[in-house]
Amino acid sequence: MSRPVPNPGILDIAPYTPGKSPVAEPGRKVFKLSANETPFGPSPHAIAAYKSAADHLEDYPEGTSRILREAIGKAYGLDPDRIICGAGSDEILNLLAHTYLAPGDEAISSQHGFLVYPIATLANGAKNVVAPEKNLTTDVDAMLAAVTPNTKLVWLANPNNPTGTYIPFDEVKRLRAGLPSHVVLVLDAAYADYVMKNDYELGIELVSTTENTVLTHTFSKVHGLAALRIGWMFGPANIVDAVNRIRGPFNVSVPAQLAAVAAIQDTGHVERSRAHTDKWRNTLAEELPKLGLTVTRSVCNFVLIHFPTTKGKTAAEADAFLTQRGLVLRALNNYGLPHALRMTIGTDEANALVLENLREFMGQP
């Protein structure tokens, strides 16, 4: 007897594995540092706005997320008509793949790029092409060398998760200039709010002046609205029109839109989170090497910690050691980084405890 057969590429997809969610136990404090969630939570104004929608849950959302698009446009100086909102930037990434990829096409991403990219690519029957990195950083020359006549889309996480590295805006522009004009360049800026580098730019200028580049962003990180699944895209009119044709008409709920509008207006909340992150990025980059560990310098709200391969000091053993003590980090085997753990920058207490416990694990006084 025959049975349904999935489309080409579906069974080649390795299911996405999110960061571990610890199970709370009575009398035991647990810190989840595995999913790059903000320790500050959402803005109080966002919480109040979310609750304000409770009396009208019978109403469908306005179909284009107009109030949220206008708020994003005002915050970034963008034309709201060139913005699309989605249920997390994940939905938008998948919509882009569905719009521009088909069997026989190719999409390029970097060696340690976000795992949603190959999932979205393969789900549409296209080939996932991996470009090697240099020092855990996107290599523009390698990406350009990977281009073939079948290339239709390039994924660029800038900055990148899980490495925490970035490329300067001049390199982004060089990448765009070197790509054929029919290739869509997707600038995934999920962690852009944490970057404090003069040579980094979001990419608005590039999107504004081309017809083949888009920018995606999220409310899950610095705004603390991961549970509500809200993301957005800024793009040229031709791409916005194409993606809107397959976007679900009510894809962002009213409570989520109201919370996001309030969140983007609370700049003080964002700045407090940025300052806290920057302080601990520097502290961890200074203290962890003293324990015999290597840290990839990050511009995000997490750090990538590399462990020795010596028995008793490995990343897997460190992961088990920390988890037992209520400190849950992210193992990265599925990213091709089996000897590293990714640590979200958490509260002062959580970060200090990680340092204290890693000092014990590494046998340092």
UniProtKB/Swiss-Prot annotation:
EC id: 2.6.1.9
Task: Enumerate the transmembrane spans.
Answer: none
Q: Where are the annotated segments for Disordered? A: 1-21
- Domain of life of the organism in this record? Bacteria
Q: What class of enzyme is it?
A: transferase
Q: Which Gene3D superfamilies is this protein grouped with?
A: Aspartate Aminotransferase, domain 1, Type I PLP-dependent aspartate aminotransferase-like (Major domain)
Q: Give the family this protein belongs to, as stated in its UniProt record.
A: Belongs to the class-II pyridoxal-phosphate-dependent aminotransferase family. Histidinol-phosphate aminotransferase subfamily.
Q: What name does UniProt use for this protein? A: Histidinol-phosphate aminotransferase
Q: What is the lineage of its organism?
A: Bacteria, Pseudomonadati, Pseudomonadota, Alphaproteobacteria, Hyphomicrobiales
Gene that this polypeptide is encoded by = hisC
